[in-house]
Amino acid sequence: MINQEEYFENVASYKLLAKHEVGQNFLIDQDVAKKIVSFLEIKEGDHVLEIGSGAGSLSFFLAQYDEPIDLIDIDEALVTKLQHDFEEKSNIHPQMGNAMRFPMGGYSKIVGNLPYYITSGILERILLNAKEATRGVFMVQKEAFLRLNAKMGNKDYGPLPLLIQYRAKMTRLLNVPRSSFSPAPHIDSLVFSLDFNDNDIEAASTLYSLLNGVFLHRRKTILNNLSGYLKDADEAKELLNKSSIPFTKRPEEISLEEYLRLLKLLKD
């Protein structure tokens, strides 16, 4: 492997090859890349997945560890670059992979600079499929983080923020200016962690289905939405009464705890 300075000079040279249609903005700030990997807290026995490895900014620091590490990207040329960069590291496995279809099971740590246009989709897949994951560290556009971290009553509060609350503790870690990338995006980024809890994946999937159903028409009341989801207004009224949720509340006015009460009654 080449030294760090030469490596990141090479990363910066990929600016002209960046594909805007798939959100390629290569991280060129070495300190930021090193911090992101350190936030992952890799330990002996971990199996690590990097999503969207790109030109290898995070991969360089991941390669300092001896644990098995899979790097996936949809860009064949970049995967070939990383296979060459890390050909002497038998634990590093660069490969073609689409995060929207790649199997997430078996990984204890997941990291990635997530493309803006599929940030929500990738996180949804992780939350509903990464059964063994204990920690994830992700960089997203700042506006995306604010949507993902939306609280009750906020216009962005909805199924995915609630699913995140159910599956993990979300912590804001680091602001990353747009100047840290080449080519520079139009907005600053932010790094956050997800520390996953022991809540059941199947229960998370059932909860997410309910949430998507009752948030289908955000401005309608929970009674209207739940009636549509269940196709039974009387059952919806009974469940809401038992859950102590007023009929006139809107979906964004209902807490995770209330939704979990409702879900329990539905399952019973």
Language-model segment annotations:
Residues 127, 227, 267:
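Short, locally clustered residues in the helix-turn-helix/winged-helix DNA-binding domain
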